[in-house]
Structures are given as structure tokens and as C-alpha cells.
């Protein structure tokens, strides 16, 4: 079975009927409440919105308003998604969104029960995070041409992402005020508004300094860089003085990977974060320290990287031990 690509899912969504006003209002109220209560990021809220609007459009009022749907209606929708080749991981995420949404509906008094709790939750496999080798990382980081302001900016972004293990959303939204060059640290606001301090190595500080002194003024054409809608001045900008998008950064990484002979389908912004974690563990980093650097709420999320490190040790043993 071939799973649907992102573009195919978007095209399918456009074929669905328009959102009913009552459902649109319900979704908006729920997202506002989630933002106030949990401080969810814009990216997470947009994901919630897409999932809830997808269900609402599919239902189109047939089984009643969105907030009143029953377990059979939800099961019908999940069955339809499976027939449309949505991935098990995507459907598992939808179940999580539905639990949150209907819990909010109960809090608001729109219903007395949470129908999503009656849905079966299949056990999903936990694929190991993909990481590049250290030599591949070195080649990828050196791929941008530093002769142009854009290339120098991209080099600094790649260096920073790998040095600090940032999520791509954290990188592109990073305010300049969160960089402390004197102490060589970043203050990162991660998922759920959780803050963490991340130290920077000499190499990433070198490229950041070059970006700030050479590329950033050139990209801004020496104009003052305005604050965004959140009141923050972005660290990384384009020629329109705006922060960069995740999609732009994704395309650049694919392009640079192809330039240095790495299969583009094996590279994504998150692969740099996985590589950061894997390489630290391979060199003896403490798991609790890695948890803090990555900004994970639970140590169990961080522990998956130990499996990759264990594989690395097994490979070394097999290659170099006389009885390997």
C-alpha cells in the first residue's frame, strides 16, 4: 500500500465540502483555549486545525455538529482515512488530537463524554531516528557557498542547528535577543513554551559572527530589521527582512545534500537534530544532559537514541575486534 504524500492529502482536503460555520467557530474556540492553557506553538496549533477541519469537512453535518460526534462516526472517519492510505502514524496523531478536542468539549459543557476514549489505539512501531555520519555532516555543513550573503547565512544556520540540536521551527523563529554571544549560549523556547539554555561551540560561534557582521547587513541592505508580529526581531532573515520559512530551509538542505552526494530523501532538518543527539552519545554524553539539551519533557523520548549508539558500538566491535 502506498501512503499518501503531503501534496496528495492537501489536494484531497480541497475536494471536501466547505467548513460549516458552527464547526469553524468550535475549532477556533478550542485552539484559542489550547494556546492559552498550554502555550502550544503556531505549528502545533496549525496541525490541530488541519486535523479537526478534515474531520468536520468529511462529516459535513451528517452526524451532527463536530462537538457532538459519536464513536461510530469517528470510527467511520478513521476507516475512510485508512482506505485513503493515510499512514498509521498520521491516524495515531489524529486520535490524540480528538482526545484533546473532546476533552475540551466536555469542559465547555457541550457533551458529557469523550467519544475518542472508546477508539482502539493500535501499538505503533518505533522506528529509530535517522542520523548522518560525522563525515556526512561535515560535508553537508560545508556545502553552502559562503561567497554570497544567502550562502553564508545558510552555513550559519546549518552550523547552529547541528551545534545546538535545534528543531527547525526553533531555528527559523529564533529571535536575535535569544543569542548571548558573550557567554556563547542560546535561550530556546521549545514545545509548550518550555525554555532551555544551549551552549554553542567555537565553530558555530565563528559562523554566526560572520553572518551577523557580513551577511545579515547585506541581506537587510543596511535597513533596520523590523520586529515580527510577536514583537521579536528575527535572527535569520531573507532579503524582505522577514524570517525564513521551514519549507525554505527544508529545500536548502535537500539541495545541499544532493551537492555532496547524500541522497536527498535521507535528509531533512530533523535529521540534523537526530545526528546531534546520536553523535553526542557516541562520544560519551550523559543521557540526562542530552535530555536537557534537546528539551525533551520525558527521558523516555531521549532514550531511543541509546539504541542508535548501541548499534554504533556493535558495528565498531564487528569491524575491529578479532573475534567480531
UniProtKB/Swiss-Prot annotation:
Active site: 167, 191, 270, 273, 296, 305
Span of domain Core-binding (CB): 21-106
Keyword list, A-Z: Cell cycle, Cell division, Chromosome partition, Cytoplasm, DNA integration, DNA recombination, DNA-binding
Oligomeric and partner information: Forms a cyclic heterotetrameric complex composed of two molecules of XerC and two molecules of XerD.
GO molecular function: DNA binding; tyrosine-based site-specific recombinase activity
Compartments where located: Cytoplasm
Family label: Belongs to the 'phage' integrase family. XerD subfamily.
Record NCBIfam families: PRK00283.1, recomb_XerD
InterPro entries to which the protein is assigned, alphabetical: CB (IPR044068), DNA_brk_join_enz (IPR011010), Integrase-like_cat_sf (IPR013762), Integrase_catalytic (IPR002104), Integrase_recombinase_N (IPR010998), Integrase_SAM-like_N (IPR004107), Recomb_XerD (IPR011932), Tyrosine_recombinase_XerC/XerD (IPR023009)
One Gene Ontology cellular component: cytoplasm
Keyword DNA damage included in the entry's annotation: no
Protein name per its UniProtKB record: Tyrosine recombinase XerD
SUPFAM superfamilies from the UniProt entry: DNA breaking-rejoining enzymes, lambda integrase-like, N-terminal domain
PANTHER family noted in UniProt: PHAGE INTEGRASE-RELATED (PTHR30349), TYROSINE RECOMBINASE XERD (PTHR30349:SF90)
A biological process from GO: cell division
Domain of life: Bacteria
Domain Tyr recombinase: 127-318
Lineage: Bacteria, Pseudomonadati, Pseudomonadota, Gammaproteobacteria, Lysobacterales
Pfam families: Phage_int_SAM_1 (PF02899), Phage_integrase (PF00589)
Annotated organism of origin: Xylella fastidiosa (strain Temecula1 / ATCC 700964)
Function summary: Site-specific tyrosine recombinase, which acts by catalyzing the cutting and rejoining of the recombining DNA molecules. The XerC-XerD complex is essential to convert dimers of the bacterial chromosome into monomers to permit their segregation at cell division. It also contributes to the segregational stability of plasmids.
Cited PROSITE patterns: CB, TYR_RECOMBINASE
